[in-house]
Amino acid sequence: EIDLKVFTEAMEAMFEGKEVKMTEAQAQEVMMKFLQEQQEKATAKRAEDAKVNLEKGEAFLKENATKEGVKTSASGLQYKITKEGEGKKPTKDDMVTVEYEGRLIDGTVFDSSKANGGPVSFPVSQVIPGWTEGIQLLKEGGEATFYIPAKLAYREVGAGDKIGPNATLVFDVKLVKVGAPDAAAQQPVQVDVQKVQ
């Protein structure tokens, strides 16, 4: 265990040119141990967060599956069509333009096309699997809510500081257009819906 007080005093003495109670090599060794301990703590916390998020997500999806209008695909994607579209239906090879809002299961909004300046365009096959599958269920003008389990989203990796490991995601989506984007559409799509490699 590192005595932070002794370490801090030694570092201050070194910077002030005073006599140091430890050599530079000893200070580096202590610093390396400290950094390693911090990394181990962060890794353990991330593993615990992943476990908790997965459990909460599974419970959310189990309850959500019983709600009126919610359907579950073979992959585990849950969706609710809130407005039937009348236009073209996309394939995985198409480019689409959408409006969306992404939330965590606690309701925290982590991304939205409105906040990013308007509709966003992207290739259907270049986003997370839950989006690739879900967007193909809609026709132009259609709207839906996608309830995406972690295995169809960012899995144990998470995305940035907003989407934790094994997070279940909820997206309200409107399919604006299938095909080449309009000039007003933002490109490329934000990281929160990009495909995880």
Task: List where the protein language model places each region.
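Cross-family detector of peptidyl-prolyl cis-trans isomerase
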Residues: 1-197
